[in-house]
Amino acid sequence: MASSVLARPGPSTVLPAMTRPPPPMAHRAAATPSFARSSQPQLTDDAVLALLANAEHTEAGEETTARGWCVVA
């Protein structure tokens, strides 16, 4: 009587790429935009310069941008 042996995946078993589970955080990282991954939002130097370039100066020394944002240096 022949008995069949089922192979179980183990350290020596190589599974095809389609049957491998994804790394634990890969699905979350792919679904999350890069700007949302950091704990605090950061403005780049170019973004700050663009805000300042579009600003209108007020008499109080503050700068109000075209969209109404107030930038205090």
UniProtKB/Swiss-Prot annotation:
One Pfam family linked to the record: Pheromone
Modified residues (Cysteine methyl ester): 70
GO cellular component, one term: plasma membrane
Location in or out of the cell: Cell membrane
Residues covalently joined to lipid (S-farnesyl cysteine): 70
Domain of life: Eukaryota
Membrane-protein topology: Lipid-anchor
Keyword Cell membrane: yes
Main location: membrane
Propeptide: 71-73
Region of interest called Disordered, as start-end residue ranges on this chain: 1-41
GO MF terms held by the record: mating pheromone activity
Database matches in InterPro entries: Pheromone
tRNA processing keyword on record: no
Key words of the record: Cell membrane, Lipoprotein, Membrane, Methylation, Pheromone, Prenylation
Function as written in the Swiss-Prot or TrEMBL entry: Activates B-regulated development.
Designated name of the protein: Mating-type pheromone BBP1(3)
Organism of this sequence: Schizophyllum commune
Organism taxonomic ancestry: Eukaryota, Fungi, Dikarya, Basidiomycota, Agaricomycotina
